Structures are given as structure tokens and as C-alpha cells.
Amino acid sequence: MTKLRDLLSFLAVICATFAPITSLGDVPVLQLDRAEFVMDDGELPPPDSAAWKPQSLPDNWNVSRPQASGFGWYQIRFVLAQQPMQLYAVYAPKISISAAFYLNGQYLGSGGAFTPPATIARNANRPQFFVATPQLLRSGGNTLHVRIWSAAGVGGIAAVQIGPEAELRPLYEHRYLLQVQFQQISAALIGFVAVLMLFLWTRRPQDTMHGYLGGSCLAALVHVALFVVRDAPLPGLWWDVLCLTALGFSVAFYALFVLRFTGRRRRSFEALLWLYMAMNPFVVALVGLKQYGLIIAFESLVFFVLFVFCMGILAQFWWRRRTVESFLVFSVLVFDLILGGHDFGIFAGTVPFESMFWTPYASALGSIFIGGMLVNRFVSNLNDYEKLNVELEGRVVQKHAELEEN
């Protein structure tokens, strides 16, 4: 009974952590979901005479302007009954890829490096929060300008909130915890499992399952870096190309793991997987710098095709064996497929743009469960081997004693 109570308490804490929180203050927080938009390369907010067009928020560029890339400006007007006396803040739960904010013509801040394509901060997975002093606001009409830069197919901005800093900061910190810090922890867990599996493989090279799972986790770690690394170590969009290519590597290595786990040998299919991994970086590099969204669509297609293939093999294997291990691997695959579909839906516009990406969590949970299963199998085999050695030594001693008696 105590264990059940502890489990329910733990689940309650998890649900409370992931549940959205809302402002409860006396001063209302404004939800700004109406804007005007114009593509413009200027470094300062365009004048009112620019070719502004009405735009509702959230705005997913892959839906509203799928081929657009470069700089765009949002002009968001709002009204305050009076000039505030306390600190205010501007909070954007999600922007892509990076943005700078101007309030009534004054620069508020940006998410980091903003000189594309050479250097650009990756903020597609980071909420934006900027404090505004009362002097920047006025009674009556106010204007917030947001300058966005994005590659084709991945730009966008969620509805923006403005209100007292004390009211908006908890919303920002809650989102930052889930969207950045927890995903950084997930990346660390994936890296740990990758190192552990590759270490076991070096100790027993004949157990290629460990090597393939380690390779899958290592590639998944590189892919998850796209979500958690803001300042890319490579110039331009080459960092994005590397991280997106890693998704294909991760799934291909996982398919090889599934074949070894189920005892299947399909040499022609395995050869295709190795050919795909050899050619994928070159294909992505050729088109990735201009068609970012196309790369996401291509890698997602490979992801779904290989996962469905693996699900078919695992379903047959589980139906024949009915083991806990086979059910666990199959369940992890289904879980990853669902969360991967959710994240692809964000790009496709079928899932709300402001939704968080769940792929890092899927990769972490899958790595932990399957990695733990293989470690348990490795330890069990080691224990059986040691037990067999003890039994053999006992038999040798017994036979030696019998020979001495004779």
C-alpha cells in the first residue's frame, strides 16, 4: 500500500511539472494573437508605409509561406489603459529560428547571435523572455516589432504575451524547464547509454546488438543537440545539416539492432541501410542549406518507413516468443513513433506551432529502457557463465577426489 501511495505521489509530481501554468495576478496579461507581417531585410522596424499584411498568431511559415526564407518582421499593436508602474515583460513561448524584439521602436533583445547565415542562434526550442521598464510603455497604443530569421519551411512565431514581469516569469521558467533543461538532461542520458553500449561492444565484439544500439544512441545524441545547443559549433546551417543527418543514422542503426535482436539476417536490406548512411550526408548537404524544410520531410519519411518496418519484424517476433523483452522493444518503438509523428506534425502544421518537441524525451526513454534490458541480459549471461565455472570446478574437484580414492 505504501509503495502504491509513493507511486501515485510521484506521478502527481510529474503531472504537475508538465501541466501548463497560467497567470493569476491582478493585472491582466495581454495575449497578442493579431499582427501584421512583411518580408524585409532591414535591421530596423519597417515604417507603417511598408507592405504589411494581416497575420494571425501563431504563425507557422511552413503553412503560411512554405518557400520563404530570410528576414521577416511582425508588427503587433496593443493598448494599455495606463502606463504601468512596475516592470513589464514580453514572453514568446516559441519562435523559429531566431528573433529580435523591439518595443515602441526601442531594442529589447534577441536570442543570441543574429548575423545569418554565418552565425545564427538556434532558438526554435527556447522560449524568449525580455524585461521592459515602465518608461518603454505608454498609455494608449503601443507597438511590438519582432524580427525573425529562418530557413525555408521552419520559421514561425507563437502568440506573444505582454504583462507584469512577476506574472510572466513563472510561465517562462516553467516552459524553459520542460523545453530546455529537461531536454539537456535527456541528452546526457542518451550519451551515457551510448558510451555504455559501445563499451560492452568493445568487450564482446561478437554481440553486435550492443554496437548497433550504441551507434543509434550516439547518432540520436547528435540529433538531439539540434534542440538543446543554441550556439552552433559549425558555421552557417552545416550544424543543422549534421544534426538532421544524424536522425537517419540513428534510425538505420536501430533497424540493424532490431534485425540482430530478432535473429533476422537480410543482407540485401542491410546493404541498403549502409548505402543510405553513406549517401545521406552528401544528399543533405546538397539541398539542406537552401531547403531546410525539405530535409526535415525527407529524414522524417525515412524515419517512418524504417520504424514501420521494424514494428512489423518486432510484432512477428513478439507473437512467436511472447517475451517481456520483445514486448518492451516493440512498445518503445511505438512510443517513439507517436512522439516523432507529433514533432513532424509541428512542421507540417497539423500540430499547433507552439507545441513543444518531444523527440528528445522519446530518444532518452527508449535508450534507457532498451539499454537497461541489454545490460540486464549481459549481467545475466555473465552470472550464468560464472555459475557454470563454479559447477565445473566442483566437478573437477569431485573427480580428482574420486581418482585419489581409487
What are these regions (language model features)?
Residues 9-19:
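Bacterial N-terminal signal peptides
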Residues 21-67, 77-79, 143-174, 195:
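Accessory carbohydrate-binding/adhesion or oligomerization-edge regions at the termini
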Residues 52, 80-104, 144-146:
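Aromatic-lined ligand-binding clefts that engage carbohydrates, nucleic acids, or primary amines
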Residues 74-86, 132-138:
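Extracellular and analogous surface-interaction loops
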Residues 221-391:
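Interfacial "cap-and-anchor" motif at the non-cytosolic start of specific transmembrane alpha-helices
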